[in-house]
């Protein structure tokens, strides 16, 4: 009987914690529709290896994927910044339309280390309808002496203060 009460108490305690614990921001936004966003995307033109912090150069691919199956979106800004926040490159002269399920990519070659280990992109998009927000991420890949590395960084929506 005592063991049954202990398990019941633990079950109720666990259930209470699950019900009343706050959900992370990501869970609240899942499934939300938007008509515009500004997205910060971490990128790494190199990372450091070993005790001497030797740079390991990486190729960076910025991927922008319109995941809405029914509506196009307009990409209005794709800017590349270096570690200290200085603008290195503006990729767009005019907006680019991404049709439903269409993808777009921008490449930073492995030999271009101007961005540094703290490089990033700012991507802005808009739509005349509420749509599923695009997936915006950077993919880093590099190989040296038979060693290879690859990883991704997912973009995060930011709010620009005016």
Q: Predicted regions span which residues?
A:
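Bacterial N-terminal signal peptides
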Residues: 10-21
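Short, hydrophobic/aromatic beta-strand segments
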Residues: 71-78, 89-91, 133-137
């Amino acid at each position: 009987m005592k063991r049954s009460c202990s398990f019941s108490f633990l079950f109720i305690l666990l259930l209470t914690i699950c019900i009343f614990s706050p959900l992370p921001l990501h869970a609240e936004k899942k499934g939300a529709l938007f008509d515009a966003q500004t997205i910060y995307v971490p990128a790494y033109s190199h990372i450091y290896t070993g005790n001497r912090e030797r740079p390991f150069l990486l190729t960076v691919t910025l991927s922008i994927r319109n995941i809405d199956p029914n509506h196009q979106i307009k990409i209005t800004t794709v800017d590349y910044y270096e570690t200290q926040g200085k603008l290195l490159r503006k990729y767009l002269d005019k907006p680019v339309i991404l049709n439903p399920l269409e993808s777009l990519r921008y490449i930073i070659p492995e030999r271009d280390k101007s961005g540094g280990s703290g490089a990033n992109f700012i991507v802005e998009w808009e739509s005349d309808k509420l749509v599923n927000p695009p997936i915006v991420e950077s993919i880093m890949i590099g190989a040296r002496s038979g060693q290879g590395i690859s990883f991704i960084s997912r973009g995060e929506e930011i709010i620009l203060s005016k």
